[in-house]
Amino acid sequence: MSPQTETKASVGFKAGVKDYKLTYYTPEYQTKDTDILAAFRVTPQPGVPPEEAGAAVAAESSTGTWTTVWTDGLTSLDRYKGRCYHIEPVAGEENQFIAYVAYPLDLFEEGSVTNMFTSIVGNVFGFKALRALRLEDLRVPPAYSKTFQGPPHGIQVERDKLNKYGRPLLGCTIKPKLGLSAKNYGRAVYECLRGGLDFTKDDENVNSQPFMRWRDRFVFCAEAIYKAQAETGEIKGHYLNATAGTCEEMIKRAVFARELGVPIVMHDYLTGGFTANTSLAHYCRDNGLLLHIHRAMHAVIDRQKNHGIHFRVLAKALRMSGGDHIHAGTVVGKLEGERDITLGFVDLLRDDFIEKDRSRGIYFTQDWVSLPGVLPVASGGIHVWHMPALTEIFGDDSVLQFGGGTLGHPWGNAPGAVANRVALEACVQARNEGRDLAREGNEIIREASKWSPELAAACEVWKEIKFEFPAMDTL
């Protein structure tokens, strides 16, 4: 008989409860290139040793349960169990540890973010022996990432589709986010695109409400896109939110967007779920649609420093599940986002190979091989005075999205769009000439406003607006 299935009825098995660390804490283990590696921030209950806490995480997120079971003898735990292979204290924190866990690749279904998360962050987060638990990072091996399609198109293909190079893309979320009729909504889209923006956007909670049904919105937005393209000679788009109550309805909306000939649709990937998101990403690649991703609900999961899932993990999961854009914070706007941490997961979204760098919160070297990259979207409380910093922080491969910073212009939507486009072009030109955007940014904007009355008006309106609060999530 195979040693995996051999049992001895006369001996039976030793029933009862035993410490997790006896089986799942293996500091001598050498990780394999095919292992999925996880870094957990563990806060044990008083009296629980860190080795037992780390082993409990490895056990409960893989093959373990609370007691010994006779069916353990029917398989090879050494082959399938998760292993806590290293534990280190968190500097400056009492009774917090980083527990490193290795998972064999055979534990996970190919091409399924849903299955990966169900194992790694499933029941274990409610484990009583832990006061708190946070998944800080994952190392996804090429052997697993290659089972995913990833983004429908990626950064280079998107630039080729839009014929836009050498600068960040400009967007705008239509406001008020709820309450407009479809025709008035389309009018706002047209004015913003005509003024110089590349994209406009449905807000995350715009789906198909009584005041504006999705089909009407799609039709009027498509009309706005075609009219703005004819006037400007540029390719334009609007993120039509296909998020719906069922996957079938979501795909139906994406099909209608394709029939209208628009370039991009949108999905709320956390509230919609990874299964729905992956299905939509596959449809988008097959049918030539770009896919914009909103991260609504992320702060419920990632904002607390000692419990939940860090956004860098959610960003990696999105790259695997599929999306061409994803909101990534602004550093300088109204939403949470510390600079080094933000730049860490921005690199994880865009680059092919990212070295371990604990100063930016990156616990593992990540090799994406040929998986396409995702454009980070900076959105939330930003305006023209932020343009130099945003251009310097995010670089060309990004989308800078101004909602109130466009629609709040005193002269209207189109002048607001003009102001943002002029500010962006001025910053890109100054950077290309070798000027320091971080040091000379305000002067660059003032110089540009001398020949752009739209920019001058925007500068006056938002000269005193700041969002200066300490970040909750720090290294």
Swiss-Prot record:
GO aspect biological process, one term: reductive pentose-phosphate cycle
Entry's EC annotation: 4.1.1.39
GO MF term list: magnesium ion binding; monooxygenase activity; ribulose-bisphosphate carboxylase activity
PTM statement from Swiss-Prot or TrEMBL: The disulfide bond which can form in the large chain dimeric partners within the hexadecamer appears to be associated with oxidative stress and protein turnover.
Site (Transition state stabilizer): K334
Propeptide: 1-2
Required cofactor names: Mg(2+)
Keywords of the record: Acetylation, Calvin cycle, Carbon dioxide fixation, Chloroplast, Disulfide bond, Lyase, Magnesium, Metal-binding, Methylation, Monooxygenase, Oxidoreductase, Photorespiration, Photosynthesis, Plastid
Amino-acid positions noted as binding substrate in the UniProt annotation, renumbered to this chain: N123, T173, K177, R295, H327, S379
Modified residues (N6-carboxylysine): K201
Stored Gene3D superfamilies: Ribulose bisphosphate carboxylase, large subunit, C-terminal domain, RuBisCO large subunit, N-terminal domain
Residue positions, PTM N6,N6,N6-trimethyllysine: K14
Cellular component, GO, one term: chloroplast
Catalytic reaction annotation: 2 (2R)-3-phosphoglycerate + 2 H(+) = D-ribulose 1,5-bisphosphate + CO2 + H2O; D-ribulose 1,5-bisphosphate + O2 = 2-phosphoglycolate + (2R)-3-phosphoglycerate + 2 H(+)
Record-linked Pfam families: RuBisCO_large (PF00016), RuBisCO_large_N (PF02788)
HAMAP family: RuBisCO_L_type1
Subunit details: Heterohexadecamer of 8 large chains and 8 small chains; disulfide-linked. The disulfide link is formed within the large subunit homodimers.
Record-stated family: Belongs to the RuBisCO large chain family. Type I subfamily.
Function: RuBisCO catalyzes two reactions: the carboxylation of D-ribulose 1,5-bisphosphate, the primary event in carbon dioxide fixation, as well as the oxidative fragmentation of the pentose substrate in the photorespiration process. Both reactions occur simultaneously and in competition at the same active site.
Note from the entry: The basic functional RuBisCO is composed of a large chain homodimer in a 'head-to-tail' conformation. In form I RuBisCO this homodimer is arranged in a barrel-like tetramer with the small subunits forming a tetrameric 'cap' on each end of the 'barrel'.
PANTHER family hit by this protein: RIBULOSE BISPHOSPHATE CARBOXYLASE, RIBULOSE BISPHOSPHATE CARBOXYLASE LARGE CHAIN
Protein name from the UniProt record: Ribulose bisphosphate carboxylase large chain
Organism per entry: Buxus microphylla
